[in-house]
């Protein structure tokens, strides 16, 4: 038994270093509604279906209280949908510019494909948004074998496992033990754990780290290591089986997992 399928998240994992396309829009729509939110608050639910992300932000105690202070009432589902409509409109204006593959992604995918591994993908974006992302990413060299969005699973995105299961079905994966899910948020890790597949957090370029490429490269070596260790701990506390610093580390990790699977088989025999 060995790994046959890898499922990658998109923004912050495969493209868009730091996952800035949605974050900047979340900050803007709340600012426009009279409620200032922090970068940390905007990032915390990252990886979820975007309307769920907005609802989760509104439920955060500080934002909830600030919303009530500004609007003189608790937020409503109408507020959620109004914010989401603004989010979608503003995101579509800039989404195409946030589709560059992160370093090592295309080379790693090619290397593992040559070893017979198939690549699926999941996302917190809708079908409509992903039409832009997939088209642009393909022109830049990144195109997984399959994509599932929350739209295709009745809006039951992360942390539900259904997008992973749909990928497994389409790609012919025989066992959850032969599937690795790589993502850059705690929602990705929870999705993988709920699906029973290997949960791997990628650190550099992740939404969880929250730095642009320029910001990360401007850090000293010591500061970079501190940021890496902090992000790694968050993934591990969420339950990740493994973490990798960049996608360049994925082939070696898959060899490690394959050895673990082989040892399990030998132990049973």
From Swiss-Prot:
InterPro entries in alphabetical order: HAD-like_hydrolase_sf (IPR050155), HAD-like_sf (IPR036412), HAD_2 (IPR041492), HAD_sf (IPR023214), PGP-like_dom2 (IPR023198), Phosphonoacetald_hydro (IPR006323)
Key words of the record: Hydrolase, Magnesium, Metal-binding, Schiff base
Comment on bound cofactor: Binds 1 Mg(2+) ion per subunit.
Enzyme class label: hydrolase
Active-site residues from the entry: 9 (nucleophile), 50 (schiff-base intermediate with substrate)
Residues that, per the record, bind Mg(2+): 9, 11, 184
Entry superkingdom: Bacteria
Cofactor list: Mg(2+)
SUPFAM superfamilies (UniProt xref): HAD-like
Catalyzed chemical reaction(s): phosphonoacetaldehyde + H2O = acetaldehyde + phosphate + H(+)
Family label: Belongs to the HAD-like hydrolase superfamily. PhnX family.
Oligomeric form and interacting partners: Homodimer.
Functional summary from the UniProt entry: Involved in phosphonate degradation.
Protein name: Phosphonoacetaldehyde hydrolase
Gene from which the chain derives: phnX
